[in-house]
Regions:
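ABC ATP-binding cassette signature C-motif
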Residues: 1-199
Length: 200
């Protein structure tokens, strides 16, 4: 299967000539590409007939269904919903990326990553530049996210709110714990105690 994945890279270089809205809309490039291919298919139908025309009609129907299912005709509202959740709306959608501070760019990158609705997301310190209300929004978003995400964070309150598993590196090994950060601490302490007893 074609697994779509992405990573919040806080040091990524962005195209400063784009506005915030143009950059965020880039999350849907695959849909804009699909629309172009659908338009080209419609144009070609005038030269088709019989079985070839039937196949083209069926294909165009599937493509149109994909656009409808993905909310292609409501992208503006979709972008603004996520952007406002993370406070990006206050930056101004027509603001050039080049005018943003480092922290503001990270917020914009996080917004685009969420809009991309990937199969796997890796979020590196996603709360670094967010206000409390925007962190709360992100918590609700991730708790409703039906696909896979991994979070690297020093914000233990945030980890408690969004974690279903904790992965730790212990004694040179990678270990997976069920539950949130508080549960991890309890299990980790028990394991450390057992480890010390085994080697005494």
């Amino acid at each position: 299967p074609n697994i779509r994945k992405g990573y919040l890279d806080q040091h990524a270089t962005l195209d400063g000539s784009k506005t915030i809205m143009e950059y965020l809309m880039g999350a849907f490039d695959y849909l804009f590409d699909l629309e172009k291919r659908l338009d080209a298919l419609y144009e070609s139908m005038g030269e088709l007939s019989g079985e070839e025309l039937d196949k083209a009609i069926a294909k165009s129907s599937r493509m149109q269904e994909t656009l409808d299912r993905e909310g292609f005709y409501d992208l503006d509202a979709k972008v603004k919903k996520v952007a406002s959740g993370l406070g990006v709306n206050f930056l101004g959608y027509d603001t050039l990326i080049s005018r943003l501070s480092g922290g503001e760019r990270v917020k914009v990158m996080l917004t685009k990553l969420l809009l991309s609705e990937l199969d796997i997301m890796l979020l590196d310190e996603p709360t670094n530049f967010l206000d409390i209300e925007h962190i709360d929004w992100l918590i609700k978003y991730l708790n409703g996210f039906e696909k896979t995400y991994m979070v690297i964070s020093h914000d233990t309150k945030f980890l408690n709110a969004v974690s279903k598993f904790i992965v730790g590196i212990e004694n040179g090994n990678i270990k997976k714990y069920s539950g949130n950060y508080d549960k991890y601490l309890v299990q980790h302490e028990m394991n450390e105690k057992q480890y010390r007893e085994d080697y005494e």
